[in-house]
């Protein structure tokens, strides 16, 4: 059976001693191959191989094939590799890589799920165990109740309430979306090069579900201001976002690969409503994926339920996720936590009989689906016939008709790079964001309030203008 290998520098690894020393380990199965473009942007690619000779041949073929003919510094022949000055090549690659700066993040968010959560039977969600963050959340709840009162909080969108900055994540909402798409170059390229429509649908479903486990942070991202932007490069995907509406918070986005063969685009509407002791978060809008040979898809993420603003804190995905094949009229339907205990049943028991991260689903015809525009409570019509069955756990794996397509241990996440032409409107240039990243909480709160007052003033000016110009 073939393995997938990640290699850090594209030419160095072909030196036999380096290959044996750094790659041929018994448990080493996954990795990223970074190739440097002429324009010096790192690009990550994956090669499936049987042995070293097979790997070398495939590497040369892929390095020189027509897909990349205009992209690389030079073409390679096998003879050239044998005579390569490894140390010189290592220095050259290192100098190129130094020109691209990884965007620094507070955490490796993909590791939070393993470090701070406990996944057990008989619960409706994963138990959050970070006591420091739990105390911080409790302090935020007390602050909110003191400011607004319990009755005023219930049913409100948490995104419309001015929260204290000590609850904030060191990312904007736009950065969060980009971070969740770190697997997109890998899974979308798998889908793009698949000839079978169901195979494409599988890989886009993997993209949808592989985002879940890296999104379990409990801190609140910065709400972007109208006109605020974020740009980055994720593998071969150039990604751009702009905040276009304040209420409800809406971000328009566009992403395109270097070869312009894959693009993603649309808009996302965010909302998070506070209940008695929980928070229900959802994204609606339109998220499209388009391939240059005419295939078009739409994805919808499941909702998130945070229980225990006070007391034991649980995190889980609920309702359903979707991938719609708009070209071939198929759908991939995912039902999250299918054994969830409902409100009525909770009066008699607080235990469910499966792990809360479990999901089931199926491929079906598009007209067998009841699609909900404004929430994630999509359903299958009665007597819907499954074409392919889906099962798995969002913290761990996904299977299609019993074949594993994704495992968290093998998840392919790409580095997010800064681009060299960041707009002045980039959210990371906000003063409150800058102060929070520096750890100056009081100053960050002060700057946040200044920006909020400016937004209120701008909103008043717009309202006054509309009133004045009524026909």
PLM-predicted stretches and their roles:
Residues 3-5, 10-58, 62, 66-71:
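Canonical RRM/RBD RNA-binding surface and closely related RRM-like beta-sheet modules
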Residues 5-7, 23, 33-35, 47, ...:
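Structural signal for hydrophobic/aromatic residues that build the beta-strand cores
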Residues 7, 13-16, 26, 35, ...:
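Generic detector of low-complexity/intrinsically disordered segments
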Residues 10, 14, 18, 55, ...:
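Functionally constrained cores in energy, signaling, and assembly domains
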Residues 67-85:
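Low-complexity RS/RG/RGG-rich segments used by eukaryotic RNA-binding proteins and nuclear co-regulators
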Residues 82-189, 193-471:
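Extended acidic, Ser/Thr- and Pro-enriched interaction/regulatory segments
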